[in-house]
Design a protein with these regions (language model features):
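Generic beta-sheet signal
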Residues: 122-124, 171, 191, 246
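N-terminal pre-catalytic "stem/leader" segment of glycosyltransferase-like enzymes
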Residues: 1-115
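Nucleotide-activated donor-binding/catalytic signature segment of Leloir-type glycosyltransferases, i.e.
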Residues: 241-255
């Protein structure tokens, strides 16, 4: 009952019906249209968030929810109609677009149909060849050390997003930039990771309440790639320290 009331507080009847239709639809997309706008943009990212813009519990599950909203707002504020489609579904969109923004594989699918469009790749990870190599290196290390046979998790499907793009917005640092081939680097603009830090934090209060021997690991899938096993090894050797692990933990590390 509490969950139902929380939904009713976040959604009008119209918004709730739109969300239900979206959930039931096979084609996961959101369309923003104003008759006076003549240009169209395609966003390959997260469409569901546009049906849940006032649901803070949903928005706070990952910073990429608000990132998707901001993309749409930028296009709307600059006189564009736009379509947002799930980045990992198979797009059958045949509309002609002026700008294409987002993640593979749909970024690549739609970019190849719109060669004259401005194509902006929104890169959330390192260059795919580097990432796949690091998955292999870290997993092989773990398997050798623990005499096990963990498969490779979090590998990235080979793609030509970076080559197709006119520009690349890359979340990360100079290290991330250096994972790309030299020929691609001039296209890249580094941007900071966004955050869901929406409440004011009192440093004074934190200093009064935190414990110097307790630490927090907060992460999603791909535990080996992120090095959780190395962190656990350290804490096993330092029993005076306490580690709280939150998030999706791959079974191989959990064991």
């Amino acid at each position: 009952m509490k969950y139902i009331f929380s939904i009713l507080r976040c959604y009008s009847l119209t918004e709730l019906m739109s969300l239900i239709i979206f959930k039931l639809s096979k084609r996961k997309r959101y369309v923003y249209y104003k008759k006076e706008n003549t240009k169209w943009a395609y966003i390959s990212y997260l469409p569901e968030v546009f049906f849940r813009q006032h649901d803070d519990n949903y928005l706070n599950t990952h910073q990429n929810k608000r990132e998707s909203l901001v993309m749409g707002q930028v296009f709307a504020n600059n006189g564009f109609n736009f379509v947002v489609e799930s980045f990992d579904t198979v797009s059958v969109d045949n509309r002609r677009y002026d700008i294409i923004l987002g993640l593979e594989p749909n970024f690549c699918n739609v970019a190849k149909k719109n060669l004259d469009a401005l194509k902006i790749y929104y890169a959330t990870g390192a260059y795919y060849k580097h990432q796949n190599l690091m998955v292999k290196v870290r997993t092989d290390y773990f398997n050798t050390k623990h005499s096990c046979h963990v498969p490779y998790y979090r590998t990235v499907i080979e793609n030509d997003a970076a080559d197709l793009a006119d520009f690349i917005f890359q979340i990360g640092s100079k290290y991330t930039l250096d994972t790309y081939p030299n020929r691609i680097r001039p296209k890249i603009s580094l941007i900071d990771q966004s955050s869901n830090l929406y409440k004011k934090i009192s440093i004074e209060q934190k200093l009064k309440t935190y414990r110097r021997n307790e630490f927090l690991w907060l992460g999603g899938g791909g535990s080996l790639l992120k090095g959780l096993d190395l962190v656990l090894d350290y804490f096993c050797q330092h029993r005076e320290l306490i580690l709280h692990v939150l998030g999706n933990i791959n079974q191989e590390v959990n064991d």
